[in-house]
Regions:
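Asparagine-centered strand-capping/turn motif at beta-strand->loop junctions
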Residues: 145-150
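Surface-exposed acidic/polar loop and edge beta-strand patches at domain peripheries
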Residues: 1-141, 152-348
Length: 348
């Protein structure tokens, strides 16, 4: 076990990359290019602590909301499992955090020179979760297994919440590509600096603005606004076996992205928090771009997820059988590039 920004962690590396995961929360904290030292993943500017040490009476810096225990330890690529979004009032009273207990769980980690295997038991959700990470040059192979410990079939939310941040992420410069098709803006108010038309449906990547003149926002370039907030949901192209997103930093000449099987994760959410949220721990300072691929289009309660029904003909939640298991495989790729690739192929 090693330390990363004051947190208990484990790392593996090869000539090209270093990958670091956190013991508590299981977050993939960095996928760093060793030549430049740049990690495209988001590192919050507030102090990071082990979620098990979070105490609302002593840690007002993380805010007083139901998401405080999550925010106390969040970093990089975090997992949303069993729910994607906030718990109901009753679930919160029973101890369930935003995005599920996995983001505050303690993981057992086995390390070899080229692989990490992480395991956690989720007693509230009655699930177990396992993730194996292997390095292959400039690519990271990630395999996950979810097991249902209960005797009942059940719906399931399962989302990979990948968040990019500076210095890789730059206003008006960082570019994006994705295999999106039909898309929809979050319904209602998402943040204090919303600028997209609430609930509007559109084709990737041109999202309708709130402007009366019918303007659009090209989601293929990070915003250059002083402050902004947005969330859009994107159906991954049904005609493709593999879905992907890729981001490119002209300053570092690095392309970073993920590729996965569309049948596993048919949705991707694009989250923009750009110096907009005033409360702790955000304090109008965070600059993020979240690329959240999973089985659900929107962060919402369990009931809302179930009541939504199919969107654009695509299911909006997953299913796991009694005592059943579900497994997925996906890749993260970090490459030196002179320009953004228009797609991200599945590694051979």
């Amino acid at each position: 076990m090693t330390s990363h920004r004051g947190r208990r962690a484990a790392s593996i590396e090869n000539d090209a990359l270093r990958v670091t995961v956190l013991e508590e929360g299981g977050h993939i904290a960095e996928i760093a290019d060793k030549a430049s030292g740049i990690n495209p993943l988001w590192r919050p500017d507030w102090p990071s602590i082990e979620p098990s040490t979070y105490d609302p009476s002593r840690h007002a810096v993380y805010g007083g909301g139901v998401d405080a225990s999550l925010l106390a330890g969040i970093m990089g690529h975090n997992l949303c499992l069993d729910i994607f979004g906030g718990p109901s009032a009753e679930e919160a009273h029973a101890g369930l955090p935003v995005h599920g207990e996995v983001s505050t769980a303690r993981f057992e980690i086995e390390r070899t020179p080229a692989s990490l295997t992480m395991r956690a038991r989720l007693p509230l959700a009655q699930l177990t979760f396992e993730r194996r990470i292997d390095l292959a040059g400039g690519a990271v192979r990630i395999r996950e297994l979810v097991e249902n410990l209960s005797a009942t079939d059940r719906p399931l939310a399962w989302t990979q919440h990948v968040t990019l941040g500076p210095p890789f992420l730059q206003h008006g410069r960082t570019e994006f590509r994705a295999s999106g098709r039909r898309s929809k803006v979050f319904e209602g108010v998402f943040g204090p600096a919303d600028y997209l038309a609430s609930g509007a449906e559109f084709d990737w990547p041109l999202a309708p603005r709130q402007d009366a003149d019918g303007g659009v926002r090209d989601l293929r370039v990070y915003t250059d606004a002083g402050a902004s907030s947005a969330y859009t949901a994107h159906q991954m192209d049904p005609a493709l076996e593999h879905a992907y997103f890729v981001a490119f930093s002209p300053a570092s000449r690095l392309a970073f992205g993920y590729v996965w099987r569309r049948e596993n994760f048919p949705w991707m959410g694009l989250w923009e928090e750009n110096r907009a949220r005033p409360g702790a721990p955000w304090n109008k300072r965070a600059v993020t771009s979240g690329w959240e691929f999973g089985v659900s289009p929107f962060p919402e309660s369990r009931r809302q997820m179930l009541e939504r029904g199919p969107l654009f003909g695509t299911p909006t939640w997953g299913w796991i059988h009694a005592r059943g298991r579900l497994s997925v495989e996906y890749w993260a790729i970090l490459q030196n590039r002179a320009a953004i690739p228009e797609s991200l192929p599945w590694p051979v």
